[in-house]
Amino acid sequence: MSKVNMRALLESFSTVILSIYPLAKSTNQQSHSHSLSLTQFLYETIRRSRVDYTTLLLALYYFIRFRDAASSKPTNYIPLLCGRRLFLVCLMAATKFLQDRSFSNRAWSRLSGLPVDKLLVLEYMFYQCIDYRLVVPKHIFARWSLLVGECCAHATARYDSTDPNVASFGSVAQYWVSLFSNVQSSLDDLFSIACLTKIAHRRMNANAALKNQATRKPSSSPQTTQDSSPILTMAPSTPVSVGSTPPSTPSVLPIAKQLAPMNVCKAHIQASNQSRTLTTASPPEQIPLMEPQVYVNPQVLPGRLSSLSKPVSLPPTPSSPKVGVYRPMTSKSNGGVAYCYNAQKLNNATGPVTFNMPFASVLPLAVSVSCDLGTASAYVASLPQPCSQKRHLEEDYSCLTEHSAKRRSYF
């Protein structure tokens, strides 16, 4: 990574960290003088920890999640309202979540200079604030990557520009601070969708311009430059210098109103040669940031599977299943589909049970019939009276004893 890209990356990360400062001001927290600037602190922490870009993105997303969780009671998390401490704790959580072998707390203590006991207290306070929700959905992480990537690209364009009329990134950093201050962690509100749509429009227009320029002759092709204007076109009321503090964060509604006059486009996707390409003939009306993800509802899935006699193709569940979530079984026989059995069907069966269901519960099924009752007559005698069709019940017991070993082998 070049020095310009590294500097732009640090500047964009600093804007995300500055977005929590209004929360720190609401608790009347005093500002302390530090020996290192925020950018220098980020550079030293990243250099010593040797983390990758994905870990940094996840750590910055934990910033937004912590800010939304602590906004209701910020006085309970005053030690974490420092940008340096919170960045260190978020980086620790992201490293431990993504990597199987990460640094210990003692190593993080030597890296940061904080005592181990203080790091443990800060880490526990952070986990308690976000309710131990470290998992980020795929579509949310894709949107967050697009948002932070645009900020990095904007900073890189400012540093690479040799035009003296182009202002530095420090003069427009206040717009990005206000953007990250109003973005919610879910990234599905009106303001977040408006910003993401505008970013997607800009990138599509830049790609279309480059494609048109490549098709023309070099002599007649005009020189086009990428638009480096900020996402928020809000002019500050007073001139702000590079070293001054950013103005107070505006509300979400005025910024969203300025982003309102924007044509949301439709995406015309053509399937050719088993690949999807975006057509540039007509303007797209919807930006497909991610392909739609279909998830299985665990409350509807058992009843649906019990009513089907043929295997169905359902999307797999996440890698870390929760209680009550269904996951696919390994294929063993019968054309690659493994047999599994339902407890209710087994208890009410009148013959050999061969339900062809491709999914089985993670938890063991609680079958009310045990196989140590002795004989079939003892099993029938244990049932409440009056009872009809005892001959079928005896057959039921024989079927259950035959399939009990098979049923246990699948779970």
From Swiss-Prot:
Region (Disordered): 210-253, 307-326
Highest rank taxon of the organism: Eukaryota
InterPro entries: Cyclin-like_sf, Cyclin_PHO80-like
GO biological process: cell division; negative regulation of G1/S transition of mitotic cell cycle; negative regulation of sister chromatid cohesion; positive regulation of L-arginine import across plasma membrane; positive regulation of L-leucine import across plasma membrane; regulation of G1/S transition of mitotic cell cycle; signal transduction; traversing start control point of mitotic cell cycle
Originating organism: Schizosaccharomyces pombe (strain 972 / ATCC 24843) (Fission yeast)
Record CDD domains: CYCLIN_ScPCL1-like (cd20557)
Keyword Cell cycle: yes
Regions of compositional bias (Low complexity) in chain numbering: 218-252
Gene Ontology MF, one: cyclin-dependent protein serine/threonine kinase regulator activity
Family: Belongs to the cyclin family.
GO cellular component, one term: cyclin-dependent protein kinase holoenzyme complex
Keyword Cell cycle: yes
Cited function: Essential for the control of the cell cycle at the G1/S (start) transition. Interacts with the pef1 protein kinase. The pef1/pas1 complex activates the res2/cdc10 complex.
Keywords tagged on the record: Cell cycle, Cell division, Cyclin
Gene that produces this protein: pas1
Protein's UniProt name: G1/S-specific cyclin pas1
